[in-house]
């Protein structure tokens, strides 16, 4: 998905401000770094319960990872997948706002990708570093 597609999809959910942040790799699309296949959300417990009542399906991806899924979305109540596990309020305090949608900062995405260390994360770390270098030089 491109920047416009991510923004359109998130806006279509009509979620209450400050009850979620777009995390995972989705900030890449908004910054024009690369397209993404899905949209990860870190949501408040209250919003999680509302989404569950709306029919979002709970899946089990591991001991601490039981997101709700709908269409291209995964809604998580925690980001406890690596040694970097920020809270919703921490991420919101450093967010990037695009068209009134809160996206995790590139610095937060970088910390998570570095802590995760999967092969795809290492590729993304290089993309982040190249993007940041181009911003400082441009």
Predicted region positions:
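Compositionally biased terminal segments of proteins
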Residues: 1-138
